[in-house]
């Protein structure tokens, strides 16, 4: 199965394409769609067209995109939501099913910790996909989104939610084992 991950943004939208065969994940492509300093409709059109081009080039079976979070600045949140909407419209117009995950679900599925840093995300993406170089943060987040979906992001996020209850009991997970 081929998965297209999207990290939406009005100026820079990250994308990552991976193949999943059983438990094996393989890197296909990643990068960014950059919008010019133009009016909002033109930028949204660039995102839509960029997604459409990616679908034609890579023929994904599924896609995953980050849910919008509420920013301190409401205007930024609205603009991000519009960029996300343009990307989703491109995916739907291309006939690609869309799954949505929060940043917390993404980080728990890829790093195992919901408050992971951008650098930790990048390093885990490199390890999980056996990359020779470190992708930029937008591309890494998009690849992470695809990995999250491949690993059944919602299930992993739910399992990750068990960790706080274990911590209250003085237990934690270390190297796949419970320690106390």
UniProtKB/Swiss-Prot annotation:
InterPro entries: RNaseH-like_sf, RNaseH_sf, X-over_junc_endoDNase_Mg_BS, X-over_junc_endoDNase_RuvC. One of its GO terms (biological process) is DNA recombination. One of its GO terms (cellular component) is cytoplasm. Homodimer which binds Holliday junction (HJ) DNA. The HJ becomes 2-fold symmetrical on binding to RuvC with unstacked arms; it has a different conformation from HJ DNA in complex with RuvA. In the full resolvosome a probable DNA-RuvA(4)-RuvB(12)-RuvC(2) complex forms which resolves the HJ. Binds 2 Mg(2+) ion per subunit. Its cofactor is Mg(2+). It catalyses: Endonucleolytic cleavage at a junction such as a reciprocal single-stranded crossover between two homologous DNA duplexes (Holliday junction). It is an enzyme of class 3 (hydrolase). The gene is ruvC. It comes from the Bacteria. The RuvA-RuvB-RuvC complex processes Holliday junction (HJ) DNA during genetic recombination and DNA repair. Endonuclease that resolves HJ intermediates. Cleaves cruciform DNA by making single-stranded nicks across the HJ at symmetrical positions within the homologous arms, yielding a 5'-phosphate and a 3'-hydroxyl group; requires a central core of homology in the junction. The consensus cleavage sequence is 5'-(A/T)TT(C/G)-3'. Cleavage occurs on the 3'-side of the TT dinucleotide at the point of strand exchange. This is Crossover junction endodeoxyribonuclease RuvC. The lineage of its organism: Bacteria, Pseudomonadati, Pseudomonadota, Betaproteobacteria, Burkholderiales. Mg(2+) 2 binds at residue 66. It holds the Pfam family RuvC.
